UniProtKB/Swiss-Prot annotation:
Residue ranges occupied by any PLD phosphodiesterase domain in the UniProt entry: 216-243, 392-419
Subcellular location(s) per record: Cell membrane
GO annotation (BP), single: cardiolipin biosynthetic process
HAMAP family according to UniProt: Cardiolipin_synth_Cls (MF_01916)
Role description: Catalyzes the reversible phosphatidyl group transfer from one phosphatidylglycerol molecule to another to form cardiolipin (CL) (diphosphatidylglycerol) and glycerol.
Catalyzed chemical reaction(s): 2 a 1,2-diacyl-sn-glycero-3-phospho-(1'-sn-glycerol) = a cardiolipin + glycerol
Regions crossing the membrane: 5-25, 34-54
Membrane topology, as annotated: Multi-pass membrane protein
Signal peptide feature range: none
Protein's name in the database: Cardiolipin synthase
């Protein structure tokens, strides 16, 4: 027997073992499971390595560690809020929010997401104003600055941020920067070294330590900034010149980001600390300076996170619950729309129940297969009666859901399998009609810059586009 035959035989045996593991042990979504089984069967050698790199699930063992004091504090608050909700004694500062107590309960039970209602919220839809505000807050920092982004670039904006962080370190402010190793793969080593030499603590999430990174498919997609424990930022903007709208390929960059002052920032801080402690040997312990109580409004909020290590798909479950609670309308903005069957059915049921569903997607792809799959799934919703709008004023990157003008979600999670099952994500769920109406006004303004994809237009698409959609939809479970 030749070496080639031996290797082929060994690969066949290993692929059969992997296929059995995928079907019986890993408890993947059936569609995803069969997609990987087909890859292993039809391209056995390449498929074997593709699965090891992109398909192997992360350990169910929690990869994030809490110090006992922080853990006890969160647990105590969560149990107290759950009990009050169960006994109908929870006091919402806006009485009509009692109608959404089940959503609050879900996030408490599902993610230990504490409900806070003393928050002030600013909304940014433009990168220039968002980063001007962030840099101004950083410049005023007195104690600490915690920065976390999926993508960081060593370009004009990246260097402006670096200059400001170095300035604050020289003033005695503690500065930590956490970036995703894959998302920030273009970040220059000289940029990182410059920060470290100045005293900025810098860490990469799931870095490539070997030739093959077996965690490459599991990325930290979160974008957080916490300043002095009471100002927090979260949303869709990363750090790079394209997010300022000066990239010729994408043009204007339309995103949504929140600036929060209030107790919700404590949950954002905890999330940063957990992520930092996973990535760094320099473990952050409980520090009262990290958790400041400042009231700046009466906006109700829960900071909800999810990831491949989660037992449940917390953010996706929150999306579905919001859709289920809708009585009048649902407005969605997402750059990628590849819903799994559960979310797709929830939207169809809402439409067929008389709820007006509007979904806005970009008019240009940054990931072609994802874009064509998005169009395919939008076609399903068009047939059910949803309205699909194509944003024409640049690139739409916002991840926003608005329901009935009363509740909303803004964050990093797209409506796709990657965000629900493979990426570490963070969203803010908002319970406040005034803030939600501000988000609604932004959505309505975007409608003026969009064109509707009607049933007639969708049915007129070319054979080439139909072919691209079919292929992209077929592989969408592994995108």
């Amino acid at each position: 027997m030749g070496i080639t035959s031996l290797l082929l035989g060994l690969t066949f045996v290993l692929n059969i073992a992997l296929a059995i593991s995928i079907i019986f042990l890993e408890r993947k979504d059936p569609t995803s499971s069969w997609a990987w089984v087909m890859v292993l069967l039809f391209i056995p050698i390449l498929g074997f390595f593709l699965y090891l790199i992109f398909g192997k699930p992360i350990s169910n063992r929690k990869i994030f560690s809490w110090d006992k004091k922080s853990r006890l504090g969160v647990k105590t608050t969560v149990q107290s809020q759950l009990r009050l909700l169960e006994e109908n004694q929870f006091e919402f500062n806006q009485p009509d929010l009692i109608e959404h107590k089940d959503l609050v309960y879900l996030h408490l039970k599902n993610d230990e997401a504490i409900y806070t209602q003393n928050n002030g919220v600013d909304i940014f839809t433009d990168g220039q104003t968002k980063f001007d505000a962030l840099l101004e807050d950083i410049e005023k920092a007195k104690k600490h600055i915690h920065i976390q982004y999926y993508i960081m670039r060593s370009d004009g904006l990246g260097n402006r941020l670096a200059d400001m962080l170095i300035k604050k370190v020289n003033e005695g402010v503690e500065v930590r920067v956490l970036y995703d190793d894959m998302g920030s793969r273009s970040l220059k080593n000289s940029y990182i070294k410059r920060l470290k030499r100045a005293g900025v603590m810098v860490e990469a999430f799931f870095p490539s330590r070997f030739i093959v990174n077996f965690k490459i498919n599991y990325r930290n997609h979160r974008k957080l900034a916490i300043i002095d424990g009471y100002i927090g930022y979260l949303g869709g903007f990363n750090v790079g010149d394209e997010y300022l709208g000066i990239n010729k390929k994408f043009g204007y960059w339309r995103d949504t980001h929140l600036r929060v002052i209030g107790d919700a920032v404590q949950s954002m801080q905890t999330r940063f600390i957990l992520d930092w402690n996973q990535a760094s040997r320099d473990t952050i312990l409980y520090n009262e300076d990290y958790y400041q109580t400042v009231s700046a409004g009466n906006v109700g909020m829960q900071i909800v996170t999810s990831g491949p290590d989660s037992e449940y798909e917390q953010i996706k479950n929150g999306y579905i619950k919001m859709i289920m609670e809708a009585n009048d309308y649902i407005c969605i903005q997402t750059p990628y729309f590849i819903p799994d069957e559960s979310l797709r059915d929830a939207l169809k049921i809402a439409v067929l129940s008389g709820v007006h569903v509007k979904i806005m997607i970009p008019n240009k792809p940054d990931h072609p297969f994802v874009y064509w799959a998005t169009l395919s799934y939008c076609g399903d919703l068009i047939q059910a009666g949803a309205e699909i709008f194509i944003y024409q004023n640049g690139f739409l990157h916002a991840k926003t859901i608005i329901v009935d003008g009363r509740i909303a979600s803004v964050g990093t999670a797209n409506i796709d399998v990657r965000s629900f099952r493979l990426n570490f994500e963070v969203n803010g769920f908002l319970y406040d009609s005034e803030v939600v109406n501000r988000l609604q006004n932004e959505f309505d303004a975007d409608l003026e810059k969009s064109t509707q994809m009607t049933r007639k237009l969708y049915d007129q698409r070319s054979i080439g586009i139909r072919f691209k959609e079919s292929i992209s939809r077929l592989i969408s479970p592994v995108l």
